[in-house]
A protein has these predicted regions:
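Conserved short "hinge" loops at termini or chain/domain junctions
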Residues: 1-95, 109-166, 177-181, 221-224, ...
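Small/polar beta-strand repeat architecture
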Residues: 165-190, 195-231
Length: 246
């Protein structure tokens, strides 16, 4: 079973994404959260990368990630645009995106509710045409805003499709074990594959922003100390579509 990032209370408490459920509807809302998150995150990431995210979320099993790349993916982060070093991107993460998609799905399936703060129309006889149009416009705006955030999340991952850093040295000691001294290991993890001078090696004994090791044939020397890797391998996104207001 998948681990959800957003939780039941995100939609029950008063606020932007409150759906106004009662205790008899709890299971319906939980089913919607699970369905929506799996569907949209799979489309956003691709199936293999979504499974990698789920593996990480399962460690704590409470919707919080452990690997820094997934923490930043979910919660957001400010980072320097790889294509323009003088420009900072303030990535907002996927938390609000998922809440918007869940809100839209749940409210649409149940033909609106969420009294006291606005959205209504459970009984069409008690809803004017204007009320219905305004409600439709509200939930469409929330959906389309989530599409905006979905595209931002894809842009974030695409910015880290390939990452490069320069090691200060690579030393063999003992034989067949190489230690790479490197001050930038952003989103690198043990077991990841790095490429050095066109050859691939598996990362072991990583010390963040300090060093890592790999094993290879003895006697190798390196002149180009560029280390490249893919923080989000198997990224195969599907582009979302906006809902028309026509």
């Amino acid at each position: 079973m998948s681990v959800n990032i957003t939780q039941f209370n995100n939609y029950v408490a008063a606020g932007e994404f409150s759906v106004g459920v009662n205790t008899n509807e709890n299971n319906n809302l939980l089913e919607t959260i699970t369905f929506v998150e799996e569907e949209h995150l799979t489309r956003l990431l691709g199936a293999r990368l979504y499974n990698a995210l789920q593996t990480d979320l399962a460690i704590n099993n409470d919707g919080t990630a452990t690997a820094q790349k997934w923490i930043d993916f979910i919660n957001g982060v400010s980072y320097v645009d790889p294509s323009a070093s003088d420009y900072t991107i303030n990535y907002q993460g996927v938390f609000r995106m998922l809440k918007g998609f869940v809100f839209w799905q749940y409210i649409s399936e149940h033909q609106y509710k969420r009294t006291s703060t606005g959205v209504r129309k459970l009984n069409a006889e008690n809803s004017s045409m204007v009320d219905t149009q305004m409600t439709n416009a509200l939930i469409r705006r929330k959906y389309n805003k989530s599409v905006d955030l979905y595209l931002c999340a894809q842009h974030f991952i695409d910015d880290y499709k390939t990452y490069e850093a320069t090691a200060s040295n690579i030393v063999e000691s003992p034989a067949t074990t190489y230690t790479v001294t490197i001050s930038d290991t952003k989103y690198l993890a043990n077991g990841d594959t790095v490429t050095i001078e066109g050859n691939e090696y598996t990362v072991a004994n990583l010390v963040d922003d300090t060093s890592f090791e790999f094993t290879a044939t003895t006697g190798l020397t390196f002149t180009d100390l560029t280390v490249s890797y893919e923080p989000f391998p198997d990224f195969k996104p599907v582009k979302p579509k906006y809902i028309s207001f026509a």
